[in-house]
C-alpha cells in the first residue's frame, strides 16, 4: 500500500537492492541503478497514451508491451519447441483479449482474487478447490537444487573462482550460499543471478580466450 506504480513495475525483478549490490560487487564494477536501468518503463507509464489509465492498467500495459513478448512468451516457445511441443495461449486470443481489455478493474481483481469475472463464470463447472486456487507459475526448483550437495559444491567452486574474484567479494557470495543451504534464508534468486553470470562469462570470455 502506498507504493508508487513505478516501484511496482520492478516487482519480482528486484533481486538485489542497491545496498546489497554495493556489498557484493567490487568497487571497480559500476553500472546504473535498477531505477535508472528501468527509466524507459517509467517514461512509458507517464507517456500521453497511458496518462488516463489507472495504476493497475498502466502496469498491465507495460507487461503486455515488454514482459510478455520479451520474457514469458519467449521462454514458453523455446522450452516447448525444444521438446517438440506446440503451446497455445488462449487468454491472448484476440477476441478474448479485446473483451478483457474493456472490463473494469473490479471485474479483473476483487478482494485480492485475480481473474475474478473468469472464476465467477466457470465456478459452476469446477470444483471449489480448483476455482479458488491461487495463481501459479512454472518456477524452476532452484531453491531446492541449491541446497543439494552436488549443486552446493559446484556453486562453491564457481563462487571462489578467479573469475568470481574479479567482480565480487567472494566471502559475501559464500555467505549467501551458506545461509541458503542452512535454511537461514531463501537466497536462491540472488545466488542464481550470480551463478548464471559466471557461467556466461566463463563460456564467452574465459573459454573463448584460451
What are these regions (language model features)?
Residues 1-210:
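Adenosyl-5′-phosphate
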Amino acid at each position: 500500500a502506498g507504493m508508487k506504480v513505478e516501484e511496482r513495475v520492478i516487482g519480482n525483478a528486484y533481486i538485489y537492492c542497491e545496498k546489497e549490490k554495493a556489498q557484493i560487487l567490487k568497487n571497480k564494477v559500476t553500472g546504473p541503478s535498477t531505477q535508472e536501468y528501468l527509466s524507459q518503463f517509467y517514461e512509458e507509464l507517464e507517456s500521453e497514451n497511458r496518462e488516463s489509465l489507472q495504476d493497475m492498467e498502466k502496469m498491465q500495459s507495460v507487461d503486455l508491451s515488454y514482459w510478455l513478448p520479451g520474457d514469458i512468451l519467449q521462454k514458453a516457445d523455446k522450452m516447448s519447441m525444444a521438446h517438440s511441443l506446440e503451446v497455445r495461449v488462449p487468454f491472448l486470443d484476440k477476441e478474448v483479449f479485446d473483451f478483457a481489455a474493456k472490463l473494469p478493474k473490479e471485474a479483473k481483481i476483487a478482494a485480492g482474487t485475480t481473474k475474478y469475472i473468469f472464476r465467477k463464470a466457470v465456478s459452476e463447472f469446477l470444483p471449489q478447490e480448483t476455482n479458488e486456487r491461487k495463481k501459479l507459475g512454472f518456477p524452476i526448483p532452484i531453491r531446492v537444487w541449491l541446497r543439494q550437495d552436488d549443486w552446493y559444491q559446484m556453486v562453491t567452486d564457481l563462487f571462489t573462482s578467479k573469475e568470481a574474484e574479479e567482480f565480487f567479494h567472494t566471502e559475501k557470495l559464500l555467505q549467501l550460499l551458506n545461509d541458503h543451504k542452512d535454511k537461514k534464508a531463501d537466497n536462491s534468486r540472488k545466488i542464481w543471478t550470480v551463478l548464471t553470470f559466471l557461467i556466461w562469462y566463463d563460456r564467452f570470455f574465459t573459454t573463448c580466450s584460451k
